[in-house]
């Protein structure tokens, strides 16, 4: 694709993989915010680092986000028109995303489709809880790639993009019933130093030419 490679940003929380007309694709490391959090000590994030490299970027920049614990591919807009176009693609579910995860234990099923509604657990936020009455429906397709007695590697294809969707769908008994390894909210955080969830593939239409673009970043685990 002729990717334009830039040096890693300071402290290496993310790498710029591709610069296109009006957008940039990055690889985010775990334990790093996608957008600013609340408080001055949470200003450092993907958006802030991209603005450092592209000081002439205009508009909101953020098109979508990954959980702070999740690593992998993100696309950000560098112009307002690109932001509108890319945001619309996410809204219309025209963006294809694939994730790799390691789940606790041995998953016997080979794959499936999960349709599970959940909502914010206010007393324990940011945790989400199963809520078939008032929750928002999340839809995820998944398949097993490899399994052992202690862990199962799966590929997730989220159809919707709810916060914590893959984590809830993995952990809940009405989903897969096996939390993602290292999940501090829905599983045993002592099993790994990070959440074993990675955005490995991202496909969308170029905001100017409508050419379909595909990006891959293998999971580091």
Question: Which sequence ranges carry the predicted segments?
Answer:
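RNA pseudouridine synthases
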Residues: 1-221
């Amino acid at each position: 694709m002729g990717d334009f490679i830039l040096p890693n940003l300071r402290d290496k929380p993310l790498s710029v993989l591709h610069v296109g007309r009006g957008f940039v694709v990055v690889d985010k490391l775990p334990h790093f915010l996608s957008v600013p959090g609340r408080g001055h000590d949470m200003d450092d994030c993907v958006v802030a680092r991209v603005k450092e490299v592209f000081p002439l970027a205009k508009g909101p920049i953020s098109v979508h986000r990954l959980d702070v614990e999740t690593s992998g591919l993100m696309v950000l807009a560098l112009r307002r028109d690109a932001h509108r176009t890319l945001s619309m693609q996410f809204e219309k579910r025209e963006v294809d995303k694939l994730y790799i995860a390691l789940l606790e234990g041995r998953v016997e099923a080979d794959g499936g489709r999960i349709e599970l509604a959940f909502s914010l657990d206010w007393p324990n936020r940011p945790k989400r809880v199963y809520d078939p009455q008032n929750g928002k429906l999340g839809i995820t397709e998944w398949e097993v790639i490899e399994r052992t007695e202690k862990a199962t590697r799966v590929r997730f294809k989220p159809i919707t993009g709810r916060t914590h969707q893959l984590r809830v769908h993995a952990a809940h008994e009405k989903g897969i019933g096996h939390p993602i390894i290292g999940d501090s909210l829905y599983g045993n955080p002592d099993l790994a130093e990070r959440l074993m969830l990675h955005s490995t593939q991202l496909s969308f239409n170029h905001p100017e030419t409508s050419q379909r673009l595909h990006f891959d970043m293998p999971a580091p685990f």
